[in-house]
Amino acid sequence: MSKKDYYEILGIAKNANEQDIKDAYKRLAKKYHPDRNKDKDAETKFKEMKEAYEVLSDQQKRAAYDQHGHTAFEQSGMGGGFHNSSNFSNVFNDVFSDFFGGHQQRTQRGRDLRYTLNLTLEEAVRGASKEIHITTLVHCEHCKGSGAKQGTRPVTCTTCRGVGEVHMQQGFFTIQQTCPRCHGQGQMIKDPCRQCRGQGKVEEPKTFSVKVPAGIDSNDCLRLNGKGEVGEMGAPSGDLYVQIHVDRHHIFERSKNNLYCKVPINFTTAALGGEIEVPTLDGAIKLKIPPETQTGQCFRIPNKGIKPEKKTPGDLFCTVFIETPVHLNEKQKKLLRDLDQSFCETSSKKNTPETKKFLESMKKFFDNLTH
């Protein structure tokens, strides 16, 4: 199948100058780039005009094409290996500058850092100011971050000529890759700084003050902008992310903005009712226990939970459990026996309805087994 004429593909005359070729390529690249044109033929046309530009923008390849046509490249495959196609790289970046608002950056933003900050429940509830200590990478003071020995400076990479990228040409297609020699920096250091060993960065301990807002919870994250590692070649520093972990409390458990606690009561208070003291974040308060309270009964105390900034406060939920008395003396034991006897003399079913239900269920269970 015969290939299209490269001049025809770009829509230019055979005597077109270098600027005409570049302008034609930019115009067609914007029109047929797959990211902008979803037509099924756009990708094919984009590859064709890219191939045409690679040949016509290179004086030697253009001369060979003008003399021999497409056969000039059938044997050599247009060469191979890494090379710095500066014309193609520049115009390609120009096109993407129009697409995305700027040239691609070779500089690399600093790495983000993470730190786990442990808080007590009281600190998380009320808010706190905490200091954290980390070790991070900062610019080397001896070389001012250049990585080069004092009195010297980095030199332009001879492989990519400072572009930071090379192009592997396979037939009519060009693969863009990071320069293997300078690793995308576009510069090389001949005499590295002894302090940072050419890295331009050194480790240094840092102390930061962190304002913890009231009501924060475990797994919440605070971001300190620009407090991460320094960037490459003047790029911005990364951020420091402070992950919050709230320690377990010896009284309260937390769920969002609500607090939960278990409170023991004696069986007399459970049976007859009364008042007990329960803890809150603001101090102890009185809680009224109604008569005939059972273990597991939960009492809600409004607005005594977590009080986050500018949000509705949570509630406190107190679950009571009846504590069985221990280490009884003989008098106490006799009183309990007398009480138990009084239950027998009256209707125990009336005093202990749950026991009655259980015994009836157990009898029914065994009856079913024997039938």
UniProtKB/Swiss-Prot annotation:
Residue ranges covered by zinc fingers (CR-type): 127-205
Gene Ontology BP annotations: chaperone cofactor-dependent protein refolding; DNA replication; protein refolding; response to heat
UniProt keyword list: Chaperone, Cytoplasm, DNA replication, Metal-binding, Repeat, Stress response, Zinc, Zinc-finger
Molecular-function annotations in GO: ATP binding; heat shock protein binding; unfolded protein binding; zinc ion binding
Residues where Zn(2+) 2 binds: C157, C160, C179, C182
Record field: transmembrane: none
Record's cofactor remark: Binds 2 Zn(2+) ions per monomer.
Positions of CXXCXGXG motif repeats: 140-147, 157-164, 179-186, 193-200
Pfam families: DnaJ (PF00226), DnaJ_C (PF01556), DnaJ_CXXCXGXG (PF00684)
SMART domains reported in the protein's UniProt record: DnaJ
Assembly with partners or alone: Homodimer.
Protein family: Belongs to the DnaJ family.
Function: Participates actively in the response to hyperosmotic and heat shock by preventing the aggregation of stress-denatured proteins and by disaggregating proteins, also in an autonomous, DnaK-independent fashion. Unfolded proteins bind initially to DnaJ; upon interaction with the DnaJ-bound protein, DnaK hydrolyzes its bound ATP, resulting in the formation of a stable complex. GrpE releases ADP from DnaK; ATP binding to DnaK triggers the release of the substrate protein, thus completing the reaction cycle.
Name used for this protein in its record: Chaperone protein DnaJ
Organism of provenance: Hamiltonella defensa subsp. Acyrthosiphon pisum (strain 5AT)
Gene expressing this chain: dnaJ
